[in-house]
Amino acid sequence: MKLKSVLYLLMLLNCLGLKSAHAATLVHGISTSWHSFSNSVSQTWNEPQTFDLYMPALTWHNRWTYDADKIDRYNERPWGAGGGMSRYDEKGNWNGIYLMAFKDSFNKWEPIGGYGWEKTWRPLNDPDFHFGLGYTAGVTMRDNWNYIPIPLLLPLASIGYGAANFQMTYIPGTYNNGNVYFAWLRWQF
C-alpha cells in the first residue's frame, strides 16, 4: 500500500512539474510578446519616419446581421479627421500610432486612438504598391456608452500606393450590434 501511495505522489508531483514548466513557458511567451509590442510602440513614437493624415471614408453595417429599420437609421458616411505617426521597421512592416475622431453610426462623435501594425507585402515590381494585414490595439469612446473608454483589439488591412493608403477594419458583434466594416484614407507626409 505504501508503494502505491508513493507512486501516486510521484505522478502528482510530475504533473505539477509539467504544469509549472508549461506555465513558465507561457509567462515567458507573454513577456517576450509584451516587450516586442512596447518596444515597437516606443520606437514608432520616438523615431517616426512619416506623419499621417487620417480621413474616415466608410462605415458599413453588415446587412446579414441587422434589421432593415436599423440600417435605415444608421449613419454610414462618417466624417471626421485624425493624425498619426508611422514607420516601416527593418522587415518592411508598417507601425503606426494614431488618434482620430469621426461621426459614428448614431451621428455622434467617436474618438479612437491606438497603435497599429501590419505585415506589409509588395507583390509587384513597383515598390510603391503595397498591401498589409495586421491588427490595431487601442481605445475608443462612444456616446451610447456614456463615453466610457473601451479597449479594442481589431484586425487591420490596407492597400496602398506610395503615400496614399486605404486602411480598414471589421468590428465583430452580435445581431443588431457590431458587425461593422470601417475604412479610412491615410496619407503619409
From Swiss-Prot:
Gene3D superfamilies in alphabetical order: 2.40.160.20
Record-listed E.C. numbers: 2.3.1.251
Location(s) in or outside the cell: Cell outer membrane
GO terms, biological process: lipid A biosynthetic process
Keywords, in A-Z order: Acyltransferase, Cell outer membrane, Membrane, Signal, Transferase
Signal peptide region: 1-23
Catalysed reactions listed for this entry: a lipid A + a 1,2-diacyl-sn-glycero-3-phosphocholine = a hepta-acyl lipid A + a 2-acyl-sn-glycero-3-phosphocholine; a lipid IVA + a 1,2-diacyl-sn-glycero-3-phosphocholine = a lipid IVB + a 2-acyl-sn-glycero-3-phosphocholine; a lipid IIA + a 1,2-diacyl-sn-glycero-3-phosphocholine = a lipid IIB + a 2-acyl-sn-glycero-3-phosphocholine
InterPro entries: LipidA_acyl_PagP (IPR009746), OMP/PagP_b-brl (IPR011250)
Superkingdom, taxonomy of origin: Bacteria
Any one GO molecular-function label of the UniProt entry: acyltransferase activity
Residues the record marks as site: Role in the phospholipid gating: 175
Active site annotation, chain numbering: 61, 104-105
One Gene Ontology cellular component annotation held by this UniProt entry: cell outer membrane
Assembly mode: Homodimer.
Protein's job: Transfers a fatty acid residue from the sn-1 position of a phospholipid to the N-linked hydroxyfatty acid chain on the proximal unit of lipid A or its precursors.
Family assignment from sequence similarity: Belongs to the lipid A palmitoyltransferase family.
Name listed for the protein in its UniProt record: Lipid A acyltransferase PagP
Organism: Erwinia amylovora (strain CFBP1430)
Source organism phylogeny: Bacteria, Pseudomonadati, Pseudomonadota, Gammaproteobacteria, Enterobacterales
Designated gene of the protein: pagP
